[in-house]
Every structure is written in structure tokens, then in C-alpha cells.
């Protein structure tokens, strides 16, 4: 983890964890991974160090969490604030994060498909339907939007429009697919 050599423009915050018999470090780590997606991780015997966007460094130990980030970066400031909120939430509540095994088992593509289908349901209401097992791929869920004589077919596994007989509907469906892809992408 390479951080800038000049630390004069960096902010450092240390939060002591209230260890009332419960180790929250693993929960915090899982919360951060679930929220920010790709992060650089280095583990030592006493602590786990995380680096996000090459700027925000988080060191998690059994008794405290240290966060260091560049003051002038709004994105880094937002990430640091989010981590502080996670710590406060974890200290104040029971376990509300997926376990590590559940996190590994969770299929991100299934979640993305469900979120996209929900987005299409919100946009098109009863005009949207899910068609299961179309063609050779029986486990692939496709969807269709039918408005009058216009029909669009969407392949949710590839997040692409398969067929559409109306240019205005095609534009709207492609726009919603684009928005859906952005909404289901991790923050960093």
C-alpha cells in the first residue's frame, strides 16, 4: 500500500472500539467490502489494513480503527465519513451484516438481475413480464415489455436488448439498462 509521502494534507482519525465481549472487526471488514467492492487488503498479526481508491487507508485492530485520507479530496472524505458511520452503526446494533461464508456464496449476478427486473417493473408496471427459460439456456431469465403493438425482449444475464420493433421503446429500454448497470456497480 503506497500512500503519499507528504502527510501534511492528510487527516487521521482513530476510533476506539467498545469491546464488550464482542469482536466487531470482522463485521466492519465485511461491511466495508460489501459497500465499496474492490479494495486492497494487507493483513498482519495484529491488524488488517485496507486501501480504497489508492487514498483512504483503514487499519482495523481488535481495539481501534484508524482512518487516514487526503483532506482536499471530496470522494476520500465521503468514504471516510461512511466508514465512521459504519463503525457507529456496528457498535450500536446487533449483527446485521452477511457472514463471510454468506458473502462468498452470494451470487452477485443474481442480485444484479433481480435489481434490474425490479427497475423494469417500476418503469413499465404490468407491461413488463419475466420469461423464464427462453431458447437453449433454460436457466436464463429474459424479460419483455409489451406496450400495444410494440414489444422489447431483454436478456438480463447479458444486460442487453435482444429484440425490439419500436425505436422509441428501444431507446427507453436501453436507457433503463444503462441506468440499471450503473446502479448495480460497486462504488469503487
From Swiss-Prot:
Biological source species: Saccharomyces cerevisiae (strain ATCC 204508 / S288c) (Baker's yeast)
Name of the gene this protein is made from: SYC1
Name of the protein: Protein SYC1
KW Nucleus (keyword) present: yes
Keyword Nucleus: yes
Further remark: Present with 1430 molecules/cell in log phase SD medium.
Superkingdom of this protein's organism: Eukaryota
Subcellular location: Nucleus
Pfam family, one: CPSF73-100_C
